[in-house]
Amino acid sequence: MMCEVMPTISEDGRRGSALGPDDAGGELERLMVTMLTERERLLETLREAQDGLATAQLRLRELGHEKDSLQRQLSIALPQEFAALTKELNLCREQLLEREEEIAELKAERNNTRLLLEHLECLVSRHERSLRMTVVKRQAQSPGGVSSEVEVLKALKSLFEHHKALDEKVRERLRMALERVAVLEEELELSNQEALNLRDQLSRRRSGLEEPGKDGDGQTLANGLGPVGESSRRTAELEEALERQRAEVCQLRERLAVLCRQMSQLEEELGTAHRELGKAEEANSKLQRDLKEALAQREDMEERITTLEKRYLSAQREATSLHDANDKLENELASKESLYRQSEEKSRQLAEWLDDAKQKLQQTLQKAETLPEIEAQLAQRVAALNKAEERHGNFEERLRQLEAQLEEKNQELQRARQREKMNDDHNKRLSETVDKLLSESNERLQLHLKERMGALEEKNSLSEEIANMKKLQDELLLNKEQLLAEMERMQMEIDQLRGRPPSYSRSLPGSALELRYSQAPTLPSGAPLDPYGAGSGRAGKRGRWSGAKDESSKDWDRSTPAGSIPPPFPGELDGSDEEETEGMFGAELLSPSGQADVQTLAIMLQEQLEAINKEIKLIQEEKETTEQRAEELESRVSSSGLDSLGRYRSSCSLPPSLTTSTLASPSPPSSGHSTPRLAPPSPARETDKTNHVPKDEAGVPRGEGPAIPGDTPPPTPRSARLERMTQALALQAGSLEDGAPPRGSESTPDSLHKAPKRKSIKSSIGRLFGKKEKGRMGPPGRESVSLAGTPSDETLATDPLGLAKLTGPGDKDRRNKRKHELLEEACRQGLPFAAWDGPTVVSWLELWVGMPAWYVAACRANVKSGAIMANLSDTEIQREIGISNPLHRLKLRLAIQEMVSLTSPSAPASSRTPTGNVWMTHEEMESLTAATKPETKEISWEQILAYGDMNHEWVGNDWLPSLGLPQYRSYFMESLVDARMLDHLNKKELREQLKMVDSFHRVSLHYGIMCLKRLNYDRKDLERRREESQTQIRDVMVWSNERVMGWVSGLGLKEFATNLTESGVHGALLALDETFDYSDLALLLQIPTQNAQARQLLEKEFSNLISLGTDRRLDEDSAKSFSRSPSWRKMFREKDLRGVTPDSAEMLPPNFRSAAAGALGSPGLPLRKLQPEGQTSGSSRADGVSVRTYSC
């Protein structure tokens, strides 16, 4: 663009105008015109320049946006593509490495196959001769005949398996390689497509950038303004950026080309891998063919070997036959030669003998004179030889006879052993069958006995119910007679009233008779009250009485099948009913219409008598249907479980008017009476309240008036009378069912044995709940004791479902007191354990042994006496009582054996002395109370028997933490391990049942038991000695783990003292274990060996502790080393400590305590012998250790 310059305006115009006004005016006009034209032209150029600038700015903005988008696309696309290409390159490298590894493996496999084939050829060439001679060696049974074809077969088999596995590997790798090649080809195609797309985009971007650049240059040249220059600079920058991007794209292309070359190289390598794989497959096929050829050659060799073996066998047979013939000939030759030599020697000998004979003949001729003497000597010798031969023959015959007898005896012994074995087997089978038959017959007899007892009890209850019903019927008959007499008396009064004048028929309004009967029953609200209308009054009264009678009879019919027992009530009927009837009749007689209704009154009385007769019939029918209702209720209760018991209790707590159907029935329409008056309480009821268990707790509910006011309408006089009669019946039944005097819970033990057998009568619900208790009752002599006040005492005492919460704490205290009384009675009488009855055994299990509630309930159901409990075997305990845990069975067996040994008449005296045992006789109790009278102290049996003194809770909660072994508490608590069982736990039970795997912890437990033995299992003595040694260094044997930690903390080693928690270190271990020294304690305290100062301090204080607080003494030879006895593993073997073998640990003798204590009397651990006060040193009973028997 050309830039036009405006002409300059001269400043001398004003001067010139003054000189020439015309010229000046013309110039000014021209100047103005030129200025205006120039202005218009400049305005147009300005507009054009502004438009161009706006378009250039718009284009610049668009180019900037495009540049940003391109940069974003490049920044997004190129790094991702580059990363993808690098990933693909890495994958290709990994695949190359895998291919190289596969090639190396294939080469190694090929080398292995070549080596195997060479080995096979060597074996075949080496053992060719041995293969041929194998059969010969086998037949000759040479010791070095190891068959070499086995190696050849093994080599062939291994070669075949190797080629098979190699073929599978090659196929698998080929498949994986093909899959990878396919994936790589797909990725390569995708990368090629993306590269083409990028090239297209770059070409499009270049074309788009070049066109706008040309347009922008033209505009700037046309306009020639400054902003257009700026746009040109910006486009130049954009072109530079584009050039840079082109360079980057070129670089990317180069990289892509490199990657493509690498991909081609990879493909070539993959092709080479494929070719090598093919070669490997060909080699594999060749090897397989070689293998087949080798197998065929092997078959040919085997056939050749078989033919050679056959030939060899035939040749061997021929050779053997030839050898035999040669041997025979050689033997014959040798024999002939020997015969010839023998004949020559014989001839020589004969010649010598001939010479000798000649000489002897000459000598005999010389000695012929002495021949008779020699003959006599020869005869004697011949006789002696004959005698010796006879004796020898006799000896041989005797030996033969003895051998024959010995054989016969051996045969008889074998037959006897066989017979003994057969007899043993037969006896075992017979004993098993007899046991089975006895158990089955026992079960059948027990079932039969239970059925008979149940039938007998039902018979007794029914007979007593019938007797009570007869009594009730007699009472009703008496009431009927009384009513008849009353009716006669009223008839007489009516007759007298007929004879009086009419003016005396009504008394004054304010008289006493009017006031007395002011509360008489009224008519319903709907009935008209017409005192002077006779007909209407009669009709109203008749309707009212008939309605009352019908409704009351309906009420009785609805309430009787409910099965609920009415509340207790006095048996005598008071005069309230008579007063009510008098009130009714008097009100009618005083009315004006009552004078003429005498017949109506008589009819009404007759109807009342008929209603009474109907009630008697209903009572009899109810007695007959009692059993049916009891069975129905039993089925309902057994099906509903605990809910039925709650419903039973809730229904028993209400009067009969509020139970079942009565609650749901509407009020009688014609009962216009108010609530009847309650009967006064009888003296029997008062004594029952004060001296006996309340009836509502004993299973018979007590209805005292209306229990829930406002819920039901007031009953009619007839229904109230029926309720009173049924209440009297229930009261009698409840009193007979209790079977005890009013103060039965406080009866003395002497009266327990003198009390006669009482029969019990049960109502429907009482019989229903009584059937469940038949199997749990003890002997008849103990029935009043075990069921002292309530029929459900035993079930509530050990109720695992928590039903005991329904009763108050007073009932539980009474039950515990009753059980303590049972045990006191057994203690006072000195009864043996076999003579204890069922309730006493159950009380002993619950209070003394401390068995759980479910075991106590099982024993109550299955154990009826102490004899049954004492004779239970281990399997019977598991089967009958259901105790599957072996430690629970051990607990029960030990408790039973302890009680049997304590209560037996042949028990040693040491077990019944105050110092030797907590079990005391009556005489010892009296002597002990007499000795404590000056101190004014009461010593009860609970304090002396000390129930639960050292039970499993004490062992788990107190004793184990004191030993430093609280981590085993849960296992000991689950196994119910008490102090009685501690001495009888073997290693297997400690490891498996109690999970005590650490041997040091078992040693710690052992020394804790030793401490208890030395203290004679006296818990109070243990606690007293621990309290005394709490602040002093004395009596280390009773120190607990906490006390030892406190002692360590007091030494200044507080940071190490916490390491003794759950370590098993306690005072008995320090005092009784001779092998435990300060180094063991330092190891348990985890004091490092570098801390020599702390170890020296511990050594010094430990020696002080041992010398001051224990019986251990320092060795005289060395100043700072203790005397060491043999190892505890050798000294305290478990069999020696327990006194029994592990096999005999299941069944322990009754005197297991003394045996176990005697076994512990080893030289390393001397026990303190505790003698009773009243025994002398020379007595035989004081020789052994008197061990205090405890109760847990």
From Swiss-Prot:
CDD domains: SAM_liprin-alpha1_2_3_4_repeat1, SAM_liprin-alpha1_2_3_4_repeat2, SAM_liprin-alpha1_2_3_4_repeat3
BP terms from Gene Ontology: neurotransmitter secretion; regulation of short-term neuronal synaptic plasticity; synapse organization; synaptic vesicle docking; synaptic vesicle exocytosis
Biased composition (Low complexity): 650-665, 1155-1167
Biased composition (Basic and acidic residues): 201-217, 547-558, 623-635, 685-699
Induction (free text): Down-regulated by tamoxifen.
Keyword Cytoplasm part of the UniProt annotation: yes
Keyword Nucleotide-binding assigned: no
Organism expressing this protein natively: Rattus norvegicus
Lineage: Eukaryota, Metazoa, Chordata, Craniata, Vertebrata
Region span, Disordered: 1-23, 201-239, 521-587, 623-815, 1155-1192
Role: May regulate the disassembly of focal adhesions. May localize receptor-like tyrosine phosphatases type 2A at specific sites on the plasma membrane, possibly regulating their interaction with the extracellular environment and their association with substrates.
Modified residues (Phosphothreonine): T712, T790
Pfam families, alphabetized: SAM_1 (PF00536), SAM_2 (PF07647)
Domain text: The N-terminal coiled coil regions mediate homodimerization preferentially and heterodimerization type alpha/alpha. The C-terminal, non-coiled coil regions mediate heterodimerization type alpha/beta and interaction with PTPRD, PTPRF and PTPRS.
Gene3D superfamilies assigned to the protein according to its UniProt record, in alphabetical order: 1.10.287.1490, Transcription Factor, Ets-1
Database matches in InterPro entries: Liprin, Liprin-alpha_SAM_rpt_1, Liprin-alpha_SAM_rpt_2, Liprin-alpha_SAM_rpt_3, SAM, SAM/pointed_sf
PROSITE patterns for the chain: SAM_DOMAIN
One GO cellular component, as annotated: presynaptic active zone
Domain SAM, residue spans: 836-902, 951-1015, 1039-1108
Tissue expression pattern: Expressed in the head of epididymal sperm but not in testicular sperm (at protein level). Also detected in epididymis, brain, intestine and lungs.
Protein encoded by which gene: Ppfia3
Protein family membership: Belongs to the liprin family. Liprin-alpha subfamily.
UniProt modified residues of type Phosphoserine: S17, S142, S207, S431, S507, S639, S644, S667, S682, S735, S792, S1121, S1162
Subunit-structure text: Forms homodimers and heterodimers with liprins-alpha and liprins-beta. Interacts with the second PTPase domain of PTPRD, PTPRF and PTPRS. Binds RIMS1, RIMS2, RIMS3 and RIMS4.
Coiled coil: 26-133, 161-501, 595-643, 1012-1038
Protein name from the UniProt record: Liprin-alpha-3
Keywords, sorted A to Z: Coiled coil, Cytoplasm, Cytoplasmic vesicle, Phosphoprotein, Repeat
Cell compartments where the protein resides: Cytoplasm; Cytoplasmic vesicle, Secretory vesicle, Acrosome
